[in-house]
Swiss-Prot record:
Residue intervals of the Carrier domain: 1-77
Record text about domains: FUM14 encodes a nonribosomal peptide synthetasecontaining two domains, a peptidyl carrier protein domain and a condensation domain. The condensation domain catalyzes a C-O bond (ester) formation and can convert HFB1, a precursor of fumonisin B1 lacking the tricarballylic ester, to fumonisin B1.
UniProt-annotated stretches for the region Condensation: 122-537
Matches recorded under Pfam families: Condensation, PP-binding
PANTHER family attached to this UniProt entry: FATTY ACID SYNTHASE, NONRIBOSOMAL PEPTIDE SYNTHETASE
Protein name as catalogued: Nonribosomal peptide synthetase 8
Assigned GO CC terms: cytoplasm
Amino acid sequence: MNSLDQWRDTWAKVLSIQPSEIDDQDSFFDLGGDSVKAIQLLSEAAQSAINVDLQTFYDNFWNIISPQLRGENRSGPIDRGGSIATGEADDSIGLLKTDVNLEVVEKALSKVNIARESVCRMAPISSIQEFFLYLGLNGHVGLINYVYQVEGRDLKQGLARLVKHLEAKNPIFRTVMIEDDTGKFTQVQLSHSISTWTYPTDLQAYLDETMTGRQRLGASPVRYSLVLKDERHKGQNFFVISLDHTHCDAFSRYLIDKEILQILKQPTEYASLQNPERPWYGDFVKHNRAHILDEQLSRYWASYMQGATLANVHPLSEAVVGGELDGEMVEIVPIPVVSQSRGTRGQTNPSHVILAAWAMALSKHSGLKDITFGLARHGRSSDSFTDLRRVMGPLVTGTPFRVTLNDTQERTEQLLNRVKEEVLKTARWEQGMVPNIHPDAEGNPWVQSMVNLKSELYGFGNESWTGDEAEADITAIKMRRDLQQYEFKSNWAILLSTLQKQGQLRLRMYYQSQLLSHDKAQALFASFKSLIAELAAADGSLVTGLLD
């Protein structure tokens, strides 16, 4: 992006508004943005080597970015370029110094037939990686499948070349997990890929098969598949990237799509030395450990959770580890639009309405006025790690989210503003060992519902690409997110997923019927839907009036 007008168009596309609606004084939240959409747009900024810290972006993006795009000089929290500190080399193995024991790791490498000469970097694994690794090793979580419909003269050769470029610039595809004799896991970045290809004849059968396997230590985290002339899909061809969940998240799909399109459009420029390798997730884990101390994190969350009651869906004694989400309810409703009463124009973010409505629905269900549930976070709020917005990996995490509803004089607008502040305040502490989200060794209780606010990453940018050369190895590619599937067992009684898309809000509630009967689930879901509409139309009404 080279002009202010182009940036304005990009912003408008992300927010699903007209460019003319964006004023220089608007904040991101005023225009209906949320943290995931912010990351999406900031990723575009990173392509132009412009880094803006997330908080500044929320507060007033245009006053800061406009001078940069006009070529003016202005001091402020913007950094152009920059590199990641990679640490000191250890000559004994040619690796970066980490907190891992090199001798122990070398033994673990030999067990999985990985030569130490092929190792570039090592790092501990993150808590979210450990969570998904245990699920994967025990067969409780399938692979993440990214499906593309493809056309071309020689797809095998063309896709092999595309994958070679992709793996060269993105170290997450060359990262394997190992375990030493002490039971400690380490992620290892290799100098070359050990990925494999398969050529199934039936796409759906292949996708089903990827849901039943187990993750293997020392194995490639990625598998590529090419399905030619699938009969179930009218002879169409499909390219599938299948990844372990320890190596990706929802935003990684968006980044992978951008990389693929760049490779297809500008293969020479993409492969050049001027196009640097993307930051490695393992470096982010080490950075996090150095900058966010576990004791600070523990103190924050201990204070945050003091006096919280987590039993707002079922009694604590009934909690299940790895239960089946065998119930499902789906509804599509209009995106809630709440007009602000303040002097400036703007809207309350729909995400804040959703969070407030869910807290109120749980309050009605449980009779409690102090509600805590889990909130899935994109994990990319930090501005201290260079180019974090281009890091592929499982940065998505979860934190407790607490809403009190015992103020009899509080009005709906005050509640929504309080929810907004809570989202920003807790985002700083989203990485690390966050308590009360999953079962732990100490037997502490965990949240009984998890809310995943999916933004409109779907539908942004190029959904397909068609080349100029009719005889090229790859002539067309189309992202087929509609064919993705993902299943896993849950420790939460409820997984609430929302998706904002094309002016509508899709609500999907998965639940464990052994913890929440169908009748109660139906009543809770109906209450949630009703409260979304009531909050949008409340116009400053008392919150207690909506809870009665």
